[in-house]
UniProtKB/Swiss-Prot annotation:
UniProtKB keywords: ATP-binding, Cell membrane, Glycoprotein, Kinase, Leucine-rich repeat, Membrane, Nucleotide-binding, Phosphoprotein, Receptor, Repeat, Serine/threonine-protein kinase, Signal, Transferase, Transmembrane, Transmembrane helix
Name of the protein: Putative leucine-rich repeat receptor-like serine/threonine-protein kinase At2g19230
Family: Belongs to the protein kinase superfamily. Ser/Thr protein kinase family.
InterPro entries: Kinase-like_dom_sf, Leu-rich_rpt, LRR_dom_sf, Malectin-like_Carb-bd_dom, Prot_kinase_dom, Protein_kinase_ATP_BS, Ser/Thr_kinase_AS
EC annotation from Swiss-Prot or TrEMBL: 2.7.11.1
UniProt cross-references to CDD domains, sorted A to Z: STKc_IRAK
Length: 877
């Protein structure tokens, strides 16, 4: 549990208030870029008076587009009228040098609106990087969706690199890029960066967010109002100089929410993060907006996850002044909840004015060695290189600059080892800057217009093994050292196509014919000696490298077999028998876990196990079972998962669990499972095909939230007792994609088929294979298709539901399920389409009837409720 800090109130003289208001108009710490507007153009935004400039000076690639005219509405912010897209290259970057550089804290914001600018009608999905580290993924649902990504970051250098990385799911683009200078003494955390999760203006009556000029830092405060809450407000200014530094705007702090019923004793705000391992920092802003009579008080205690904030016993908001409670250490878990509980002596209920929540993002990847960066940037400037050379030369891994190759070793910055500038229009002499690229192994300067002599310093690059200077205009005599290295075999040297370049003294004054020279290596005793020495060194290097690679993937998540025995209490309790081995109950650091012991007959080898674990450790989603740790010791292999103790979807459908799922619960569980699969297909790199989607692999927690299990395992392990079955055909009869099964090739559409079958089970409550039916109607898809063709939806839906379902929605979901379970992959939906259909249906199901749930649920996953029951939460202390 993190401690909270309480920022006391400090009053300032009126002239300080005036000074702050004047500063509120100051944009000196702002960089506001409208991507896609003409070069050197600028304008002032009509609503905010912020000056926006063209992005042309900050990027060297991309194409400019206007969004579709039908989306250019009057109320659309001007910044979304144009975009810059990046159809070429895997990584494209913006380089921005803000007014204050290294060591200063900035709010960095990117905004995206597709607007069907390319007339393809398909919104893209791509990754967003800050420097060399993944910031977030950008997923747009449709043409009018506006996605905003915001991060608070202390600069490590004078420049900010914002990069878009193509995931082959549509062309990356950018609408707006904004930087806002913050005070270094606010949002102070141990984390490198804070990604905005939610920022709410509670009680705001408008639809638009508050921002600059109301907020001097131009933060977006989204309006949020809860049903059955009372809005409190004041026309007086909330003093923005209350000295906590956060300075939430007066327009935000002048409204608050409180329970409408005076008998309500508490407000509870909670949400379930998609990943229980996410770490959050929370900031709650309070200001009393009512002038209370002397005989009345408003005081309350604040709890986070049932523990009281470590301040005084009760908190009393100050009239017209802002106080901020914030968590000093990050909090995490599957369920985050903070409660405002009315004090015993209080005559007024609790209030809230504003909330900010941020998620940590540990930026662990290292940028390229600074010496190499300086050198390659000098080369770029010297030769006016016309390549997409922005951002980091080597990182992120897999996305180096065009013509650049790098070496990557653990805990060390990447180094540039190869530079290919052939056909780059280079002119002038070979610059001495190349000698500063000390790890350089390959240098290709061929097919340019370089002049002058070949410099001696190239022979002094210790690791250089290939040098190509062909087809230039070089003159003079080839340096003796280079010639010697070529002869002894330590350097592959190409200098053909330089008519005035002499490779020996005899041709000093002789014009050579235009031909290709490839200087052969000389087979000599010395050459053999160096070759043997190189082979020995290479063998030792590979041996060391192999010894490193066979170590634990992540020591923090690696457990010895003896620890597994202890965690499971010597394998005392068996939870179940999975396809890959038994699953045991365990307790790890006070938390329940499920340990899957992979049977010795199922393991395909350590390399496959390592690759599987390495992939699974990176997969995090609220609808996927979280992998907590692993073990590989000798022939013992185990995977440690979070514990889900409420059974599987199969238990509910088969009647093993006596509870009957309502229609809405079935839709929610189906949506959860679909979202998990959609993440495996589109949110993982490389994509993961589950290959064994079925109800028993969909676990249900106590809140009836579904989580997919056993994803990925079928790629590296065979089913126990079925060791002769190819890993390519893992799956369960009835759920197997018939088209791919026959070819033994599986894809995402194979999972779509299996999910369609599961969805039919959820709708009907019937088994997949019916032995009592004729051969052509044994499979559930055949039976449902036949009944649907007769227009009899009631005979399709599970009779246990009675009349408690929407026939129109049932018809629609049945059609979705059959479209998924189509025998032809071409006619099947994608999981993204399935998720969209289920979301819409669930929304309609919830609005068409009264669920009896008193909580208010936002699509943002945050919920608020009021209660008068003091027993469910801790008492004030």
């Amino acid at each position: 549990m993190g401690n909270f800090n309480f920022l006391p109130l400090v009053s300032f003289a009126s002239f300080v208030v005036v000074l702050v208001l004047v500063c509120a108009q100051d944009q000196s710490g702002f960089v506001s870029i409208d991507c896609g507007i003409p070069e050197d153009s600028s304008y002032y935004d009509e609503k905010t008076d912020i000056k926006y400039i063209s992005d042309a000076a900050f990027v060297e690639s991309g194409t400019i587009h206007s969004i579709d005219s039908k989306f250019q509405k009057k109320n659309l912010e001007k910044q979304f009228q144009k975009v810059r897209s990046f159809p070429e290259g895997k990584k494209n970057c913006y380089d921005v040098q803000p007014p204050q550089g290294k060591g200063f804290k900035y709010l960095i914001r990117t905004r995206f609106m597709y607007g069907n600018y390319d007339n393809l009608g398909k919104a893209p999905d791509f990754d967003l990087y800050l420097g060399v580290n993944l910031w977030d993924s950008v997923t747009l649902e449709n043409s009018t969706t506006i996605v905003t990504k915001e991060i608070i970051y202390t600069l490590r250098s004078d420049k900010v690199h914002v990069c878009l990385v193509d995931k082959e799911r549509g062309t990356p683009f950018l609408s707006v890029l904004e930087l806002r200078l913050l005070k270094n003494n606010i949002y102070e955390t141990a984390s490198d960066s804070l990604m905005l999760y939610r920022r709410w203006d509670l009680g705001a009556t408008g639809d638009l967010p508050a921002r600059y000029k109301d907020d001097i830092f131009d933060r977006f405060w989204m309006p949020l109002m809860f049903p059955n809450f009372l809005i409190l407000n004041t026309s007086l200014m909330i003093d923005p100089t209350s000295s906590n530094g956060f300075l939430p705007p007066s327009v935000v702090m002048s409204t608050a929410v409180a329970p409408m019923n005076s008998s309500i004793e508490q407000i509870m705000v909670y949400w379930e993060p998609r990943d229980p391992n996410w770490k959050f920092y929370i900031y709650i802003h309070f200001a009393e907006v009512e002038k209370l009579p002397s005989n009345e008080t408003r005081e309350f205690s604040v709890f986070l996850n049932k523990e009281q904030i470590d301040t005084t016993s009760v908190f009393r908001p100050s009239y017209l002044y802002t106080d901020t409670l914030y968590v000093q250490n990050p909090v995490s878990g599957p369920f985050l909840e903070f409660v405002l509980r009315q004090g015993v002596k209080s005559t007024r209920p609790p209030i809230m004015n504003a909330i900010e929540t941020y998620r940590t993002n540990e930026f662990l990847d290292l940028p390229t060695d600074q010496n190499d960066v300086d050198a390659i940037m000098k080369i770029k400037t010297k030769y006016k290189v016309k390549k997409n050379w922005l951002g980091d030369p080597c990182a992120p891994f897999g996305y180096p600059w065009q013509g650049i190759n790098c070496s990557y070793t653990a805990n060390n910055p990447p180094r540039i080892i190869s530079v290919n500038l052939s056909f780059s229009g280079l002119t002038g002499q070979i610059d001495p800057v190349f000698i500063t690229l000390t790890p350089l192994q390959k240098l290709d300067l061929s097919n340019n217009r370089l002049t002058g002599t070949v410099p001696d310093f190239l022979a002094n690059l210790p690791d250089l093994t290939e040098l190509n200077l062909e087809e230039n205009k070089l003159t003079g005599i080839l340096p003796e050292k280079l010639l010697e290295r070529s002869k002894d075999g330590s350097l592959s040297l190409r200098v053909g196509g330089n008519p005035d370049l002499c490779v020996s003294d005899s041709c000093r004054n002789k014009k050579t014919e235009r031909k290709e020279y490839i200087i052969p290596s000389v087979a000599s005793v010395t050459g053999l000696f160096f070759l043997l020495l190189a082979l020995i060194s290479f063998w030792q290097f590979k041996k060391r490298q192999q010894s490193v690679k066979t170590g634990p993937l992540d020591t923090k998540r690696y457990y010895k077999y003896s620890e597994i025995v202890e965690i499971t209490n010597n394998f005392e309790r068996v939870l179940g028998q999975g396809g890959f081995g038994k699953v045991y109950y365990g307790v790890l650091r006070g938390e329940q876990v499920a340990i899957k012991m992979l049977s010795k007959s199922s393991a395909q080898g350590y390399k496959e196990f390592r690759a599987e674990v390495e992939l699974l450790l990176r997969v995090h989603h609220k609808n996927l079972i979280a992998l907590i740790g692993y073990c590989h010791e000798g022939d013992q292999m185990a995977l440690i998962y979070e514990y889900i103790g409420n059974g599987t979807l199969g238990d509910y459908l088969s009647g093993k669990n006596s509870s009957i799922l309502s229609w809405e619960e079935r839709l929610q569980i189906s949506l959860d499972a679909a979202q998990g699969l959609e993440y495996l297909h589109n949110g993982c790199k490389p994509p993961i095909v589950h290959r064994d989607v079925k109800p028993t692999n969909i676990l249900i927690n106590e809140k009836l939230q579904a989580k997919i299990a056993d994803f990925g395992l079928s790629r590296s392990f065979t089913l126990e007792g079925d060791s002769q079955v190819s890993t390519e055909v893992a799956g369960t009869i009835g759920y197997l994609d018939p088209e791919h099964y026959s070819m033994q090739q599986f894809s995402e559409k194979s999972d779509v088929y299996s999910f369609g079958v599961v969805l039919l089970e959820v709708i009907t409550g019937q088994p997949v294979i019916s032995r009592s039916r004729t051969e052509e109607n044994r499979h559930i898809s055949d039976r449902v298709s036949l009944m649907l063709s007769k227009g009899d939806i009631k005979s399709i839906v599970d009779p246990k539901l009675g009349e408690r379902f929407n026939a129109g929605l049932a018809w629609k979901i049945t059609e979705v399920a059959l479209a998924c379970a189509s025998e032809s992959t071409k006619t099947r939906l994608t999981m993204s389409q399935v998720v969209a259909e289920l979301k819409e249906s669930l929304c309609r199901a919830r609005t068409s009837g009264d669920s009896g749930d008193i909580s208010f649920s936002e699509p943002t996953e945050m919920n608020v409720s009021m209660t008068v029951d003091p027993g469910v939460l801790p008492q004030p202390r």
